[in-house]
């Protein structure tokens, strides 16, 4: 489950719980919330490494979910210098011949990435193309479809000197 969906579920559950009427006359520990008002529920009982913290700054406020295991490791490494983590680009970067040094744009222009073979058209083919556009005939091939019961003279071939009977 992704963090935004968890965050949204807890935020809606918290807002529903805060909007519920508070009964001060009885000593009930639980708030009476109608089932229709509940948008979602997030159970964190079995997760011991998840902490929910209130968060607010000048632009945002809400609940912050953190992994306590990662937070404790990061707190221990606070004084460690990052000198050994720096790497020089020429050491690990390898470019193939002709590969650009820059990152490609998401919406690249056609001339930038399109490569045409000799004789290939610049346009997209139509779904119902005309016959002259895609039909290719070999020398001596007829333009028509052969009949199923073709006449003998049409398909019979005689060698020189061969009798007709």
UniProtKB/Swiss-Prot annotation:
Residues 1-19 form the signal peptide. The keyword rRNA-binding does not apply. Keywords: Cleavage on pair of basic residues, Pheromone, Repeat, Signal. It comes from Saccharomyces cerevisiae (strain ATCC 204508 / S288c) (Baker's yeast). This is Mating factor alpha-1. GO terms for cellular component: extracellular region. Residues 20-89, 105-110, 126-131, 147-152 form a propeptide. InterPro entries: Mating_factor_alpha_C (IPR006742), Mating_factor_alpha_N (IPR008675). The mating factor alpha-1 precursor is identical in S.italicus, S.uvarum and S.cerevisiae, except for the number of tandem repeat units: 5, 3 and 4 respectively. GO terms for biological process: mating; pheromone-dependent signal transduction involved in conjugation with cellular fusion. Pfam families: MF_alpha (PF04648), MF_alpha_N (PF05436). The active factor is excreted into the culture medium by haploid cells of the alpha mating type and acts on cells of the opposite mating type (type A). It mediates the conjugation process between the two types by inhibiting the initiation of DNA synthesis in type a cells and synchronizing them with type alpha. The keyword Signal applies. It comes from the Eukaryota. The gene is MF(ALPHA)1. GO terms for molecular function: cupric ion binding; mating pheromone activity.
